[in-house]
A protein has these predicted regions:
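Polar, glycine-rich mid-to-C-terminal structural blocks
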Residues: 105-107, 143-243
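Long, intrinsically disordered, low-complexity segments
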Residues: 64-66, 87, 123-140, 144-148, ...
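Short coil/turn linking the two alpha-helices of tandem helical-hairpin repeats
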Residues: 31-38, 80, 102-114, 325-330
């Protein structure tokens, strides 16, 4: 460590904590997408003698970054505890939450290269892989996870429990799910500190959040030449119908109307079941600083909308998952968190349906693990989380197949359709769609 760091100033220790987290986050994103990669902890030499490196085992990389994250936590303040440490800076809450996320991936399933890194007693193969389509070994590539996966799940549970149970924890669920997205689009901080960390962008300088995905708006409608809400990222009717119709999150995850000129300028309902827009980003929620630039822009203008890396419900759901998978049950209360796995899940669902709603307890229709799998889909739609979750659970192939079958049955119209925890009959899907406009005849 440098002389400045060793001097013991709290500022230098905070900077060290931020640096450790950012490096760990970078390697984490590489490893969970690419597996075994080149890895080094020191600086590159001026003669480039340590630049060209071979791959090393992902388990070794995970072990290193977990250790770094554990160190970083000790140096970091809670959000708001020190001036300028807001959701755009690395803070204690995010570092602990990120360590939990890293630990779950470190202990999760992934495709492994058995030729370069042969399986041994430290690696556990996917059970009954040859009888599980999509999970069988192919050309020495196999699905595996570390044999000590429970150690990582213990880390995840502990870190989440410490956040939940700490009286100094400043993070809470925003009571209004829509407020999360209206605030971030408007370049405002979340009042409840729900967002543990946001990648900071600047209007006119960086960030295509909203222009590449979000509620669709055509160009040349009085707000500038360019439109908003592209289809670079979109979803489909299968995901829409997975929601309970009373779930407050549904119309933020899936948004059918397009704002365009159809006689007059208004929203028009589209019915492409394979291309449903994400509703979490809207031009009409953006900051005036962005709109004023967009009004005269001839090319795509960076919105400045921050990308939310982690929200507080992730802490609750990771806690619930890790505790349950460690065999501690869904109803036993954690001494550290002060709540059970089931209660953590219910807190997330209470916001979606309202406290006291009978729908909050509908998760009991399925196994608790399946309830967690479903809840994470509904809570984090369009946030870049689902695919990677399914990989670490070993469920990516089977969930894709379930979706394909369901959508074929939806189009066929002669079979019951299973979508998540719901069974639909063909006649439940409408042939005609009725909707109404607001008092101005502009928005549905």
């Amino acid at each position: 460590a440098s002389e400045a760091f060793n001097s013991g100033t709290t500022a230098m220790r905070r900077y060290m904590g931020e640096a450790l987290v950012l490096r760990s986050l970078s390697y984490f994103e590489l490893v969970r997408r690419w597996g075994d990669i080149p890895f080094k902890e020191g600086m590159s030499n001026s003669d480039l003698s340590n630049v060209y490196m071979g791959k090393i085992n992902r388990d070794s990389i995970y072990a290193c970054i977990v250790k770094d994250m554990q160190e970083a936590i000790e140096y970091l303040p809670w959000v708001g505890e020190v001036a300028d440490y807001n959701s755009e800076r690395i803070t204690k809450g995010f570092a602990k939450g990120m360590l939990a996320r890293i630990a779950l991936f470190a202990g999760g399933w992934s495709v492994r290269d058995g030729k370069e890194f042969p399986a041994n007693t430290s690696v556990e193969r996917y059970p009954n892989a040859e009888q599980s389509p999509g999970m069988e070994e192919v050309g020495e590539y196999f699905i595996g996870r570390p044999a000590n996966w429970r150690d990582y799940y213990e880390i995840a549970e502990q870190q989440c429990a410490e956040i939940i149970g700490d009286p100094e924890n400043p993070h809470r669920l925003d009571p209004d799910y829509g407020d999360i997205w209206k605030s971030v689009c408007g370049l405002k901080a979340n009042t409840y500190n729900e967002n543990l960390f946001e990648v900071a962008n600047g209007v006119g300088y960086s960030g295509d959040i909203g222009t590449l995905m979000g509620r669709a708006m055509d160009g040349n409608l009085g707000y500038g030449q360019r439109g908003f809400g592209g289809t670079y990222v979109s979803t489909n009717a299968y995901y829409f119908y997975s929601f309970d119709q009373n779930d407050a999150r549904r119309d933020y995850a899936c948004y059918w109307p397009v704002y365009k000129k159809d006689g007059t300028i208004k929203e028009v309902m589209q019915n492409d079941i394979m291309s449903v827009r994400l509703g979490k980003w809207s031009f009409f929620w953006t900051a005036e600083s962005y709109r004023s630039i967009a009004l005269t822009a001839t090319a795509r203008t960076p919105t400045g909308i921050n990308w939310i890396v982690m929200r507080y419900p992730d802490i609750l759901l990771m806690f619930a998952e890790a505790r349950y998978m460690l065999g501690k049950g869904e109803n036993s209360v954690s001494d550290v968190a002060g709540i059970s796995a089931a209660r953590a899940l219910e807190m997330v669902r209470e916001r979606a349906f309202g406290s006291g709603s009978e729908a909050v307890m509908d998760y009991k229709k399925v196994d608790f693990f399946d309830a967690i799998v479903n809840e994470r889909a509904w809570e984090f739609g369009g946030e870049g989380i689902r695919k990677l979750d399914l990989i670490r659970w070993g469920l990516l192939d089977s969930k894709i197949e379930e979706m394909k079958v369901a959508m074929l049955y939806m189009l066929d119209g002669s079979h019951p359709i299973q979508i998540f925890d719901k069974t639909y009959q063909p006649e439940e899907f409408p042939n005609k769609l009725y909707f109404k406009y607001d008092e101005n005849g502009e928005f549905i």
